[in-house]
């Protein structure tokens, strides 16, 4: 007992501090060489956690980029990270070294939520045979699946009409468009996965969207960041269950939908939806322990498609309508092109896009300016690589700062302003600079890119074909400030949609 009092206690404390510092130094030394990227000096144990704002990481990285350059190091706890900025460095990492940077690091909060070998879905799965199998299945299904006798475009076009009908019911009123946009995009995903559509007033749909919103809130910000850096806190009884209530509730909703689908699935009939196609693959894979087609992975893949494909598209559409309010001259020019190419009676089709360079440019500029996913999910290096003459060692976590590419001053004429001419040449033809990477690039590019582009074009043109969007009477002009969350959304705003008259 005497050891724990007086000088003995101080000796124990000093020994403990020295031990922690030595362990910390060994962790750093494993990844440090003279050729490593520069970066801020880290604190022992905490690293650079106190030097960045976890609630607004893009701005923190912007300031660090100005100081240290396009490739710099961070130490988050004991995890070495390298942040990649600018088009040139991003191309090196995602394309030139794509095979060596396609892996995912382990994310403790996702492991707690059920991501594990055999049930890792496709978005979070490590780079390897399991990921390749699920990526191939998801991409081919999204591209080629015929839902009954309807193509995917038919489903999106049908939902665009329902969305316009919902706007018509509130024409001339002050409305928040986000709920209706979420409903429409969610129904497209539900049609693809379950061949099912919900009425916008359906309590089941309302609850599902509420839980999905909570999911994104729960995985962003300070607390999840701390849990990822110090996963020992996940062992505190009840803490993780309290933090991730929305995640569990949302997956329970998907489980119910999967159960309903399974009870009506007939393996002798052509698949009605993605779930049927996955169930058929499970049957084929029975007896093959190497296959990633199993019941647990089905729910993870479905969860990936909902979370990755729903809120991102609806948030982009929310930015689109806001920017049309703030730039009425752009809105009028889009409507003129719609009238000239499609007219005011015929429904928009994807085939119209090639003849509508200005509308296409506006949609692309909405994605660039909105910048809704500035920091995609991190990567991890599977071997040593060189980036901009710096050595990035094996096992380093990579943070691709897509915002630095979409707003790269060396590429874009007016990077911080909404300027559709970024995507038009001198003759008014549509052009797409290589710095346009809202869907990322390389092996881990967004698997739902084709579907998202279809939804953005058909929903946007359908709405502007039928309505003029403006600020409601008596309300202030909304701002283009952003809410730094996942995804990055505009501040809540109200709009007034007025039916367009024929010929206007």
Curated annotation (Swiss-Prot):
Residues that, per the record, bind heme? 446
The topology of this chain with respect to the membrane is: Peripheral membrane protein
Give the top-level enzyme category: oxidoreductase
> Cellular location of this protein?
Endoplasmic reticulum membrane; Microsome membrane
Any GO molecular function: iron ion binding
Which keywords does this Swiss-Prot/TrEMBL entry list? Endoplasmic reticulum, Heme, Iron, Membrane, Metal-binding, Microsome, Monooxygenase, Oxidoreductase
Q: Which reaction is catalysed here?
A: an organic molecule + reduced [NADPH--hemoprotein reductase] + O2 = an alcohol + oxidized [NADPH--hemoprotein reductase] + H2O + H(+)
Which is one Gene Ontology cellular component term of this protein? endoplasmic reticulum membrane
Q: Does the keyword Iron apply?
A: yes
EC annotation from Swiss-Prot or TrEMBL: 1.14.14.1
Q: Which cofactor does it need?
A: heme
- Induced by what? P450 can be induced to high levels in liver and other tissues by various foreign compounds, including drugs, pesticides, and carcinogens.
Please state what the protein is called. Answer: Cytochrome P450 2D11
């Amino acid at each position: 007992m005497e050891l724990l009092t007086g000088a003995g206690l101080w000796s124990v404390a000093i020994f403990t501090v020295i031990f922690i510092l030595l362990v910390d130094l060994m962790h750093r030394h494993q990844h440090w060489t003279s050729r490593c990227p520069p970066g801020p000096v880290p604190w022992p144990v905490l690293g650079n956690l106190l030097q960045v704002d976890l609630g607004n990481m893009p701005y923190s990285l912007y300031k660090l980029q100005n100081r240290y350059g396009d490739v710099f190091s961070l130490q988050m706890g004991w995890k070495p990270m390298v942040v990649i900025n600018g088009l040139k460095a991003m191309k090196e990492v995602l394309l030139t070294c794509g095979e060596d940077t396609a892996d995912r690091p382990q994310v403790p909060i996702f492991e707690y939520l059920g991501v594990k070998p055999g049930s890792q879905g496709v978005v979070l799965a490590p780079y390897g045979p399991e990921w390749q199998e699920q990526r191939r299945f998801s991409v081919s299904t999204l591209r080629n699946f015929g839902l009954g006798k309807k193509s995917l475009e038919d489903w999106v076009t049908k939902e665009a009409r329902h969305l316009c009908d919902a706007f018509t019911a509130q024409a001339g009123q002050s409305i928040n468009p986000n709920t209706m946009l979420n409903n429409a995009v969610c129904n497209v995903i539900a049609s693809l996965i379950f061949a099912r559509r919900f009425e916008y007033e359906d309590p089941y749909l309302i609850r599902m969207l509420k839980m999905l919103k909570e999911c994104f809130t729960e995985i962003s910000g300070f607390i999840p960041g701390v849990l990822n850096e110090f996963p020992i806190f996940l062992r505190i009884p009840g803490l993780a269950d309290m933090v991730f209530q929305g995640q569990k509730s949302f997956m329970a909703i998907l489980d119910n939908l999967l159960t309903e689908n399974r009870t009506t699935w007939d393996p002798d009939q052509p698949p009605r939806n993605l779930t049927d196609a996955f169930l058929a693959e499970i049957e084929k894979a029975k007896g093959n322990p190497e296959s990633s087609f199993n019941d647990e992975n089905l729910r993870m893949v479905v969860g990936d498609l909902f979370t990755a494909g729903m809120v991102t598209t609806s948030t982009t559409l929310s930015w689109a309508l806001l920017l049309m309010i703030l730039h009425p001259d752009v809105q009028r020019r889009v409507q003129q092109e719609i009238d000239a190419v499609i007219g005011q009676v015929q429904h928009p089709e994807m085939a119209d896009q090639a003849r509508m360079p200005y509308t296409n440019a506006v949609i692309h500029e909405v994605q660039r300016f909105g910048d809704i996913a500035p920091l995609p999910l991190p990567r991890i290096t599977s071997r040593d690589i060189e980036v901009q003459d710096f050595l990035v060692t094996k096992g380093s976590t990579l943070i691709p700062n897509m915002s630095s590419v979409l707003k790269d001053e060396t590429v874009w004429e007016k990077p911080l302003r909404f300027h559709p001419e970024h995507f038009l040449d001198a003759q008014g033809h549509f052009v797409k600079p290589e710095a346009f990477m809202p869907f990322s690039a390389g092996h881990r590019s967004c698997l739902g890119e084709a579907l998202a582009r279809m939804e953005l074009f058909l929903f946007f043109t359908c709405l502007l074909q039928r309505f003029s969007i403006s600020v409601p009477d008596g309300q202030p002009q909304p701002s283009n400030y952003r809410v730094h969350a996942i995804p990055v959304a505009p501040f809540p705003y109200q709009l007034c949609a007025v039916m367009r008259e024929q010929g206007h």
